[in-house]
């Protein structure tokens, strides 16, 4: 039963990541184009908050409809078409992109001369974002960690609900804070939260400490994800933002793949506690590099 849950959890995150791969870059580029620079952090924080609310309200609604319609998958999936159609209608009729003045025909933006226009500050954000992801493997391991404490299988989904509620509640306030505070300082605090979360999740004592780790994990996500998106917008040329977000998502996706693969190997060979300790070590190295860059 636990194995089946692990497979379903892994499948959930694979599907989620594939959705982000197709919509993440154009969505973030559109927000960066429409949001005034002085409130860009708040805009991305609100985006992360609403996106997270949808990610856990959708499955809860699907569960309710499955019970209401006697496990009729076909009807439930047809019901899911409704919000998708509403989203497309809102995109086409309610969102106006800023005007772009282009001379001649469109060309492929992924060209050597365009990549040279992406500054070292941009590539630093890409690197630090990939390092964050390398230290923060798939949330499926949070589910497995709580399950190992003896929580009944029926209540295991509470892990993602709690983490996402914290994430959604804190993303906008942290995003708004990013508009008036040092981005590097907030990144450092976000890494510190991740280190504390890893230490709590590695704890073999009371199960309550593990739940503290879940909350800290959600706070880390809220503090860093919208902030990194805003930093990409600040460091990339306006006409290359889609490309910039695409490379950022590519680097983060590869880092997540590597991190989750290594975490799985560590989990199977050395146990859950060592897996999260390894995450804390990687986070500590990233924090040290960030602080060294701040002092340079």
Model-derived regions: residue spans:
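C-terminal ends and interior cores of transmembrane alpha-helices
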Residues: 1-5, 192-205
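Cytoplasmic helix-loop-helix junction between adjacent transmembrane helices
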Residues: 12-50
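Transmembrane alpha-helix termini and helix-breaking/packing motifs in multi-pass membrane transporters
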Residues: 57-77, 258-274
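Helix-to-loop junctions at the C-terminal end of transmembrane segments
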Residues: 66, 170-182, 267
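Symmetry-related core transmembrane helices of the 12-TM Major Facilitator Superfamily/SLC fold
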Residues: 75-92, 274-291
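Structural signature of the two symmetry-related core transmembrane helices
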Residues: 81, 185-200, 280
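Helix-loop junctions on the cytosolic side of multi-pass membrane transporters
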Residues: 83, 91-105, 292-296
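Juxtamembrane intracellular "pre-TM" segments in multi-pass secondary transporters
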Residues: 97-128
């Amino acid at each position: 039963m636990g194995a089946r849950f692990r497979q379903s959890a892994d499948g959930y995150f694979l599907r989620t990541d594939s959705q982000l791969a197709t919509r993440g870059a154009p969505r973030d580029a559109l927000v960066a184009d429409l949001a005034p620079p002085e409130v860009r952090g708040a805009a991305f924080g609100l985006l992360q908050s609403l996106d997270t609310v949808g990610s856990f309200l959708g499955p809860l609604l699907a569960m309710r409809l499955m019970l209401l319609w006697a496990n009729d998958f076909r009807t439930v999936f047809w019901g899911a078409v409704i919000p998708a159609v509403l989203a497309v209608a809102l995109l086409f009729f309610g969102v106006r992109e800023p005007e772009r003045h282009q001379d001649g025909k469109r060309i492929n933006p992924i060209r050597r001369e365009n990549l040279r226009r992406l500054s070292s500050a941009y590539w630093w954000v890409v690197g630090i974002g990939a390092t964050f992801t390398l230290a923060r493997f798939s949330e499926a391991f949070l589910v497995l960690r709580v399950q190992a404490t003896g929580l009944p299988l029926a209540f295991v989904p509470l892990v993602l609900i709690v983490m996402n509620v914290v994430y959604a509640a804190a993303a906008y306030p942290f995003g708004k804070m990013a508009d008036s505070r040092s981005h590097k300082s907030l990144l450092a605090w976000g890494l510190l939260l991740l280190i504390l979360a890893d230490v709590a999740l590695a704890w073999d004592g009371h199960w309550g400490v593990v739940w503290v780790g879940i909350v800290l994990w959600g706070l880390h996500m809220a503090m860093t994800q919208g902030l990194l998106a805003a930093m990409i917008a600040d460091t990339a040329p306006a006409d290359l933002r889609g490309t910039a977000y695409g490379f950022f998502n590519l680097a983060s996706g590869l880092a997540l793949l590597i991190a989750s693969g290594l975490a799985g190997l560590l989990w199977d060979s050395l146990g859950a506690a060592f897996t999260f300790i390894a995450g804390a070590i990687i986070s500590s190295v990233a924090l040290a590099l960030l602080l060294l860059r701040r002092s340079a």
